[in-house]
Amino acid sequence: MENLEELRIFLEELEQICYQIFQSGFSSVHDTTLQELKIHSKEAEDYGLFFASKAMYELWEILEASKHQFSADYTKAVILFGHLKEYLFWCLKKLELMQVRLTLETQPE
């Protein structure tokens, strides 16, 4: 149960990073948010969240490169962001179900 709680907290941190990106817009993401995105992409792999890891790293690459462009195309970033948000949503839902199942299995009849 502790591992599930740790994973839930991590997924919520990823959601928060996505919220910060959404709030600032792709063309003006804060440097600290970009740094968090890169760091958390590596941590996601440690949790076995390989899709999230890859999507976050690719998103970081696009946003980092676009900082130095006058007119950047964010099409790929928007698609990655959408897929990442949906992935995180379903990960959190699955985690909820796992926690409920575990709670039900450990209750005495």
Sequence positions of predicted segments:
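Amphipathic, well-ordered alpha-helical segments in soluble domains
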Residues: F10-I17, E36, A55-L59
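Amphipathic, coiled-coil-like alpha-helical segments
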Residues: M1-C18, F50, H68-E109
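Amphipathic alpha-helical segments within well-ordered protein domains
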Residues: K38-K42
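Secondary-structure edge/capping motif, primarily at the C-terminal ends of alpha-helices
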Residues: I17-S28, A44-Y47, L63-F70, C91
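Short, well-ordered alpha-helical segments
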Residues: T33, Y47-L63
